[in-house]
A protein has these predicted regions:
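Small/polar glycine-rich anion-binding or flexible loop at a beta-alpha turn
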Residues: 446-448
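Substrate-binding/catalytic cleft of secreted carbohydrate-active enzymes
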Residues: 55, 179-190, 194-432, 441-443, ...
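Secreted/periplasmic carbohydrate-active enzymes, especially glycoside hydrolases
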Residues: 1-205, 210, 214-218, 246-249, ...
Length: 650
């Protein structure tokens, strides 16, 4: 039995409680292998040949000497054997034997974000019978960092289009169901990210496996504090006793993942520049990493010295960076050029940034090789730090808090919400990353006598909507995001105006009196109209649409189907301002384990089967039981026809 006593303030975000990740009890023969002892370094490639170093340990926990044969096989991404060797091993009782060998793979298929090719190593040990066998996936790729060339993956420059990510799974809480972990990676890839910073603790093994399979680069991060506390019951109370063991565990567990490019020793650490404590701890942690892996860079996320009043960035930050291979800057993008002048060999990246400064960040990163990328806080919404990204309308004399109280429950700073949908800042980021030619959003008027206050991590109160009943004739601010020199704006086919785009922010703003209909923004190339986007006023609710990300799932509780619920008008257009109470039912070989929406302050239970839509949408998460068959999900709302969808389990 496991008893959990999780009391006090042990984290700055929602950490979860109990056993929320897979726990495996491994029973082995006396002569056995261990996945975490096995390291396959496939980071050396020259021409059409990869040189692979394989290290492992053979254990004999018995008292008798054993003569065995160790067989090592390497299989290509297509499952073809490309290398094999068998060697005899004599191992005395109660001893361990290190195993090391080097071999070449000709014409290797390199792992990359666009082509994440994975090889497989199969190790087996046999005496009179098979004693043990393990399978270790790995990727062949090279990783290089320099101020002159930037970050190179397989010899090619690549800017890190990154997002920070906490470990929770939104409406599911902290539980790391395999499909939920995989979906996070899919959402990041689908929205232009090629890298993730695991903030600020180790991700699940399955999350890393998904990053390997789908091609998402990873900064693996281990600590949010060292000896000095951020919360009374946080990890600081265990740091001296456990930090070396825990960072070794991170590296031993994760070093075979080709997706991982950096090891991070901490986030916004209080002692980062303290003398001599900060440097002593940093060197110790880095030495432990290098004991188990020297093929990757070390890093940390370093913030300003708001907590050290006698320190300054110019005078003291060098001590926080001097032992690191790559320097992570939390919100300090204004220091990039000054620091490059002082330390021209320093390799930098934005380990945390905010959406409203994204253009300034990316403009610098795009043109400077010593800046290798940026990681927004955050890619996906997460539980805890409630309302960190709020935007409020305040009267004179009112002040905005850093966090929001009940009923706010999620941070609201993600580009992507709990339903997996893009928020306005994600469409803006698409312009920065050249994934979209033009985007359009609408900001309603602030109440008379008030002002809009955007918290530092927040975004202006804008919507991808032209549904503003009751605002007829009132002035809306329409933001057009584009890289074109000029854009035009039309309302119901009337040209409202033509404006130059501010190429520092990729924005042109128009003031438009509201009237229902079609709002259309168009890019101009010279005098020629090119790409366009539009927002249209929709009708009243007429139907419910259900869309499952997977309509066929395994009869296994580690699989899920995320079913999106949308309220449409008679023309099958999403109604973006629609809030409708729903009732969800399921029947068959599974059930709904969570339901809700993307709102940051809708505190009804995630287990409730009566969520409301938020901005026209909600989501139901369906989990199968262990039987093959079908699951039927039905959703109803007052005055609308019931909708149903069938999910097959196999």
């Amino acid at each position: 039995a496991v008893k959990v006593v999780n009391e006090g303030l042990n984290s700055r975000w929602y950490a979860g409680s109990g056993i929320y990740r897979h726990v495996w009890l491994m029973k082995t023969d006396k002569v056995h292998l261990d996945e975490w002892d096995t390291f396959i370094d496939a980071s050396k490639v020259e021409g059409k040949k990869a040189t692979v170093d394989l290290h492992s340990i053979l254990h004999n926990s018995g008292k008798e000497k054993v003569t065995a044969h160790l067989k090592i096989q390497i299989f290509s991404p297509q499952g073809e054997e490309v290398y094999s060797t068998t060697q005899p091993v004599n191992i005395s009782g109660e001893t361990n034997i290190p195993i090391s060998l080097t071999f070449d793979i000709k014409k290797p298929e390199l792992w990359s974000v666009d082509s994440p090719s994975l090889y497989t190593a199969h190790l087996s040990v046999k005496s009179k019978k098979l004693s043990d066998e393990i399978t270790v996936p790995f990727g062949i790729r090279t990783v290089e960092f320099s101020a002159e060339k930037g970050f190179l993956l397989n010899g090619k420059p690549l800017k890190l289009k990154g997002g920070c990510l906490h470990h929770d799974n939104g409406l599911l809480g902290a539980v790391a169901i395999n499909r939920a972990e995989e979906r996070k990676v899919e959402l990041m890839k689908a929205n232009g990210f090629n890298a993730v910073r695991c903030s600020h603790n180790l991700p699940s093994e399955y999350f890393l496996q998904a990053c390997d399979r789908l091609g998402l680069l990873v900064i693996d991060e281990v600590f949010d504090q060292w000896q000095q506390a951020k919360r009374p019951q946080d990890y600081h109370q265990f740091f001296d006793e456990w930090s070396e063991h825990d960072i070794a565990t991170m590296v031993r567990r994760d070093r075979n993942h080709p997706s991982i490019i950096m090891w991070s020793i901490g986030n916004e650490i209080a002692e980062r520049a303290d003398e001599p404590t900060g440097e002593i701890i940093a060197r110790k942690l880095i030495a432990t990493i290098h004991k188990y892996d020297t093929s990757r860079a070390t890093t940390a996320a370093v913030n300003s010295f708001w907590d050290r009043r006698d320190f300054s960035w110019e005078k003291d930050s060098e001590r926080a960076f001097r032992n690191l291979d790559v320097s992570g800057y939390n919100y300090q993008w204004k220091e990039y050029e000054k620091d490059h002048a002082r330390f021209p060999q320093r390799i930098m990246y934005g380990s945390e940034s905010v959406p409203k400064e994204a253009a300034q960040n990316w403009n610098l990163i795009d043109k400077n090789s010593y800046l290798i990328g940026d990681f927004v806080w955050t890619a996906l919404d997460y539980l805890g730090e409630a309302g960190l990204a709020h935007t409020l309308e305040l009267a004179p004399g009112e002040h905005s808090p850093q966090f929001m109280g009940w009923p706010w429950y999620n941070a609201w700073c993600g580009d992507i919400d709990f339903c997996g949908d893009k928020k306005p800042q994600s469409y803006y980021r698409d312009i920065l990353w050249k994934r979209r030619d033009i985007s359009l959003a609408v900001q309603p008027p602030v109440a008379k006598g008030k002002r809009e206050d955007i918290n530092y991590w927040g975004w202006k109160n804008e919507f991808l909507s032209w549904n503003w009943k009751g605002y007829e004739g009132e002035t809306m601010v329409v933001h057009v995001y584009s890289r074109s020199p000029k854009v035009r704006l039309y309302l119901n086919n009337r040209l409202l105006g033509e404006k130059e785009v501010n190429l520092d922010t990729y924005t042109a703003s128009f003031e438009v009196p509201y009237e229902p209909g079609q709002l259309k923004a168009v890019n101009l190339k010279g005098k020629k109209e090119t790409t366009s986007t539009e927002l249209c006023t929709t009708g009243i609710p007429a139907m419910i649409r259900l869309t499952a990300d997977h309509t066929k799932i395994k009869a296994d509780k580690n699989d899920l189907s995320y079913v999106k619920v949308e309220i449409l008008d008679k023309n099958e257009k999403l109604i973006p301002d629609c809030s409708v109470p729903l009732e969800i039912k399921s029947a068959g070989k599974g059930s709904v384990i969570a339901a809700g929406n993307g709102s940051a302050d809708d505190m009804r239970s995630f287990r409730s089967l009566k969520p409301k839509t938020f901005r026209g949408k909600a989501i139901a998460i369906v989990q199968p039981n262990t039987e093959k068959g079908t699951i039927t999900l039905t959703v109803s709302a007052e005055g609308l026809p019931e909708a149903a969808i069938v999910i097959e389990t196999y």
